[in-house]
A protein has these predicted regions:
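Active-site-adjacent core segments of small-molecule enzymes
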Residues: 2-4, 21-537
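Cleavable N-terminal signal peptides of Sec/SRP-targeted secreted and luminal proteins
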Residues: 3-19
């Protein structure tokens, strides 16, 4: 996607979505004269400035746009006297400086990304969904943001950690967010375990250090997390940047037809660059030398016009097939081992951000951003994310997070959500704030929406759900381990040992080894031997 295309899209949004009702801006002046005030004139100038090359910067001004003789000019009472409070340029600059950062994400704080396009290359999805977004030949602008999960914003982006793989697809029917990871499973299936699990991935509340005691104490008490831990401590846990890893939906979603019929779907993005990972030693060295290694790798490849791409594929199951599958199709700790993947399209990144804070840090993704024809499953973790992600956006950016240019749809928006902090697109002008008889937003036609889903839970009763682990939770980790090469098994043993040798609570180590023995006795033996070797030095 070329830079000027992005500018045109941004300006189109501003002009069509928010300036369509220009007559409402007309102000009656004395003498009967009528003039039209363009509320967005300054905003459009600043948007144009955003796309201006840095060699053609405008003159220096204060925050309110007044010409200024220089940034370092301060007013004081003589050369040795106190500063004057009327030195407002200094006061404004210092006040702005201490507010330059919004709260970092609770998880996925270290991130990087780029713009690109999603081309639908087949008609496979059309068989199961009426979504225009998935029609063969459709092309959509996208934003991808990659991230580590547990680290803070300044942590190494090559660290051993799952990678966030978030994609914002700007369709003509609204924004579709795919908030994926670089792994087909996750650590939890009960959403209430997420806060406490993340606590174990952060720092000890007393020492403020990463604490392997917490990490492995959580693991042995929650064996359903073992599949994700196996992937994390293999070399897959240290991918060679973002370009050489796959992305997975993890959750099961639904593709929905207009009559309300549906199938389960999972999504995988297969890297066209080939899978490539660091060893533990390489990742440690890279992280020590350059904490932004993956960020630089992606940026430099796009600058060199070596555009990374991924082939998008879907796997589907009918409701009947879902019931017959050995594992719960909505269990986030389980993969679909029998999946057949069908090509849907291709995603290509071809434009770097001009401003990281504005386009990447200020980006917001939520699985609740859906379009007709795409729907959530009853996966408990996904259901919880439908609320928590948008709520995180309200906390981090404010209630108008979807009005920032990076997040706003590339189509008009009409609803009754109003005001709040910084409604930068004009707060819908004088359009109705309730369903007015004098004129209101026109509901979408039946052709644009989907019939209500069929009843799934007739006579359902309220029950307590915990999602306790059972023997079936060891099957997929066993399959994963037994299909590793001898060298990959050796690295897995060594990687586990590198972390577990630092555990100071003996019962934690012994309980983890017992859990490994249930997965495969050779895993338990290999890790035990590697821990002994690590302690010997």
């Amino acid at each position: 996607m070329k830079t000027n295309l992005f500018l045109c899209l941004l300006l189109a949004v501003l002009q069509s979505a928010f300036l369509a009702n220009a007559d409402s801006m007309k102000q009656k002046r004395g003498g009967g004269d009528t003039s039209t005030i363009d509320l967005f004139a300054g905003l459009k100038l600043q948007q144009a400035q955003y796309m201006t090359d840095k060699s053609n910067s405008p003159g220096f001004t204060t925050e309110n746009g007044a010409p200024s003789s220089g940034y370092f000019n301060i007013q004081r009472a003589g050369q040795d006297g106190p500063l004057l409070i009327q030195s407002t340029q200094m006061l404004d600059s210092l006040a702005h400086f201490v507010r330059e950062r919004i709260p970092e994400r609770i998880v996925h704080a270290r991130g990087w990304g780029a713009w690109g396009k999603f081309e639908v290359t087949t008609d496979f999805a059309e068989k199961y969904s009426f979504a225009p977004a998935f029609k063969k030949g459709a092309v959509h602008p996208i934003l991808m943001r990659f991230s580590t999960v547990g680290g803070q914003s300044g942590s190494p982006d090559a660290a051993r950690d799952p990678r966030g793989f978030a994609i914002k697809i700007k369709t003509k029917q609204g924004v579709l967010d795919w908030v994926f990871n670089n792994t087909p499973v996750f650590f939890i299936r009960n959403p209430l375990k997420f806060p406490v699990f993340i606590h174990t991935q952060k720092t000890n509340p007393q020492t403020n250090e990463r604490d392997p005691n917490m990490v492995f104490d959580y693991l042995w008490q929650n064996p359903e997390a073992s599949m994700q831990f196996m992937r994390l401590f293999s070399d897959l846990g240290t991918p060679y940047g973002a370009r050489h890893m796959n992305g997975w939906s993890g959750h099961t979603y639904r593709l929905v037809k207009q009559d309300g019929s549906w199938v389960y779907v999972k999504v995988q993005l297969f890297t066209d660059q080939g899978i490539k990972n660091f060893t533990a030693a390489e990742a440690t060295q890279i992280g020590g030398e350059n904490q932004e290694w993956a960020t630089k790798d992606l940026f430099d490849s796009i600058e060199a016009k070596q555009y990374p791409s991924w082939t998008v594929k879907f796997a589907v199951k009918t409701p009947e097939e879902g019931k017959k599958y050995r594992y719960n199709v909505n269990d986030l700790t389980k993969d679909w081992l029998d999946a057949t993947w069908y090509e849907v399209g291709k995603m290509t990144l071809n434009q770097n951000p001009r401003n990281y804070f504005d386009e990447i840090e200020s980006s917001h993704f939520s699985p609740s951003n859906m379009v007709p024809g795409w729907a959530p499953s009853e996966d408990p973790v996904l259901q919880s994310r439908l609320f928590s992600y948008n709520d995180a956006g309200r906390y981090r950016i404010g209630s108008n997070y979807n009005k920032l240019p990076v997040n706003c749809p590339f189509n008009t928006v009409g609803n009754y959500d109003r005001s709040g902090v910084m409604p930068v697109t004009g707060d819908y002008g004088n359009q109705p704030i309730y369903p007015s008889s004098a004129g209101t937003y026109k509901p979408a036609s039946k052709d644009e929406t989907v019939a209500p889903l069929i009843k799934l839970y007739n006579n359902a009763t309220i029950e307590t759900y915990v999602g306790e682990a059972t023997d079936i939770d060891y099957e997929q980790p066993r399959y994963f381990y037994q299909h590793l090469s001898a060298n990959d098994k050796k690295n897995l043993h060594s990687n586990f040992a590198g972390a577990m040798s630092k555990v100071t609570q003996p019962n934690v180590v012994s309980n983890v080894i017992k859990m490994f023995n249930k997965i495969d006795p050779n895993l338990a033996k290999g890790v035990t031997a590697a821990i002994a070797a690590a302690k010997k030095g």
